[in-house]
């Protein structure tokens, strides 16, 4: 069964360098041979793309520049069937992130937000028929996008559409007051986050306690655990753990 969903969030061109060693062992100030590739990326763009691959009707809400990076991103969306409209900001440059991927598949990222800043209520599509909304945390964590994103959330909630929120990385969250971020959580129906983010938001290293703390604000919480799978829980329900599918890790960028 497919759903109709739109994703709000960051759109990036990923420049991925597969390095032969861990980042702290690189030859700084010298050369290190790598394998480099480029892909569409950004948390919002990644989720939109994979939802489309799974056969859902997906619309992307975000911003890119009128440059070659932006053209590459929209071309990838077109090939996957992701709907997009009015993404291009004239005169702006698209967001780009340089990603170092070590032999274990772990990533280290250097993002340049570019055109992603400045989302506003006018970027929101007509809400008729949508079943769900995915919101990347990178958007409200951007000060120039926060007012517009809050307006979007208000309109979406009034329309009765559930919002699934992924708060982004701890590094990004540390640039915003923690209490400010916590105040947003009550606005969402479901919280999707990893272990590090759950611990940061709650101060609880015990995942059951972290789930219960987060469920004071959200109806449902899912904590992603990498190679250990995921654990989720509804408010007043029992937690459910799902193991990860065995696979060779190549790149955890998304």
Which positions does each model-derived feature cover?
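Conserved phosphate-binding/catalytic region of the ribokinase-like
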Residues: 1-6, 15, 31, 154-158, ...
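Glycine-rich phosphate/adenosyl-contacting loop at the front of the ribokinase-like
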Residues: 1-61, 68-72, 79, 243, ...
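Residues at the starts of beta-strands that form the adenosine-phosphate
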Residues: 4, 57-59, 83, 161-164, ...
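Active-site flanking residues adjacent to catalytic metal/cofactor-binding acidic residues
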Residues: 8-9, 165, 193, 223
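Residues that scaffold the ATP/ADP-binding catalytic core of kinase and kinase-like folds
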Residues: 15-16, 110, 131, 201, ...
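Conserved N-terminal subdomain of the carbohydrate kinase-like
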Residues: 23, 28-31, 38, 53-135, ...
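Structural alpha-helical scaffold elements that stabilize or flank donor/cofactor-binding regions
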Residues: 125-126, 183-184, 214
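Conserved beta-alpha-beta core of the PfkB/ribokinase-like small-molecule kinase fold
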Residues: 132-211, 228-230
